[in-house]
Amino acid sequence: GKYQFGKSALRTVGIYDYQEFLRNAEWQDKAFEALIARNKWELRKEIQKYSGRIINGVEITESGLVAAAHLGGAGSVKKYLRSNGRNGFKDGFGTSLSSYIRKFSNYDISHIEADANAKVNLE
């Protein structure tokens, strides 16, 4: 697919047919936006508190934090921030939260509302 999602993440946004998801670019885009909305909600306090700060030489931004949550989960991002970057997650390929925070720091995701229960509308 266009983005990397675990099956459990897809289920949280209402997608249960993984094969159809892989074939359907529209579902992939909708799932991506729904997961951004959920991560923005989950990280809303951290976004407000940490945006603009520098941790490990990287400026903290909303889009960077949301991308890092896509990599390692919102809980890992919270631990990273609370530890001032000392408690860092890496995925199975060695990709770190801080690398995602840097790489995705300047994206405008303001058009996506924070939503604790965001789901994909499949109609």
Which stretches of residues belong to each language-model region?
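Non-catalytic cell-wall polysaccharide-engagement segments
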Residues: 3-30, 34-123
